């Protein structure tokens, strides 16, 4: 997902002390969300402690617990906000591809490539969160699936408008290409993996939207 904002100046707050930024323009909730987003995306959830979060946000620990209840509560709020921002960006960006559905579908991986090229790209927070949590804990998986369903629903709608024989199946296949490209780009730091995914996606689109030829009727014989 796209990271929220450029890194802000880290402020030091005494543990358990009063929030020094109370009354400032940006709420403590927003500062904690911004700090959580930056730190979780770059360093990982498990590697980021509460002390680092409140130091980055310039708040007290008690403020974090009062607003979010726990670090896990902050993690879930960060994922919700990041998912919403990323989906808004992704959908609006591919919809700029042209008036018809096919140009929009063709823009999926060029758009994804611009995300990969961003120096703040650290992979997908949802994939990362599921990977870091207990595999028997369904909370992160449920949040990740909810995000994925919204993305695939939009792709499926475009696929249906493009005349795909199986819009849901096509959307699922493109979704797998997106996930694979994200992981490959995160590991290799090579945004060109999006180009290979684009070639595969165009092949899928061509196959799914190719008109079905009707069999010619046999010629009448005398």
Positions of the model-derived regions?
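N-terminal intrinsically disordered/low-complexity leader segments
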Residues: 1-27, 209-222
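Hydrophobic/aromatic-rich alpha-helical bundle segments in the mid-to-C-terminal region
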Residues: 2-3, 140-146, 160-222
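Short, structured helix-loop boundary elements
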Residues: 29-30, 50, 72, 76, ...
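Helix-turn-helix
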Residues: 31, 35-73, 77
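Hydrophobic alpha-helical connector segments
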Residues: 77, 91-118, 161, 167, ...
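Amphipathic alpha-helical packing segments from all-alpha helical-bundle domains
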Residues: 84-87, 93, 103-107, 136-161, ...
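Amphipathic alpha-helical segments used for helix-helix packing
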Residues: 104, 118-138
């Amino acid at each position: 997902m796209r990271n929220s904002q450029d890194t802000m100046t880290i402020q030091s707050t005494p543990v358990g002390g009063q929030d020094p930024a109370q009354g400032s323009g940006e709420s403590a909730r927003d500062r904690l969300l911004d700090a959580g987003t930056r730190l979780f995306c770059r360093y990982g959830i498990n590697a980021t402690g509460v002390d680092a979060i409140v130091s980055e946000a310039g708040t007290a620990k008690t403020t974090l617990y009062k607003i979010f209840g726990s670090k896990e509560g902050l993690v879930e709020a960060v994922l919700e906000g990041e998912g919403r921002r990323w989906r808004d960006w992704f959908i609006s960006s591919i919809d700029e591809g042209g008036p018809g559905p096919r140009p929009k579908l063709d823009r999926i991986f060029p758009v994804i490539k611009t995300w990969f090229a961003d120096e703040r790209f650290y992979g997908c927070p949802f994939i990362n969160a599921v990977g870091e949590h207990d595999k028997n804990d369904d909370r992160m998986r449920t949040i990740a699936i909810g995000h994925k369903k919204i993305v695939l629903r939009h792709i499926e709608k475009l696929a249906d408008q493009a005349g795909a024989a199986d819009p849901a199946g096509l959307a699922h296949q493109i979704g797998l290409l997106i996930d694979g490209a994200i992981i490959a780009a995160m590991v290799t730091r090579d945004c060109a993996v999006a180009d290979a995914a684009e070639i595969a996606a165009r092949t899928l689109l061509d196959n799914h939207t190719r008109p079905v030829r009707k069999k010619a009727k046999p010629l009448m014989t005398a």
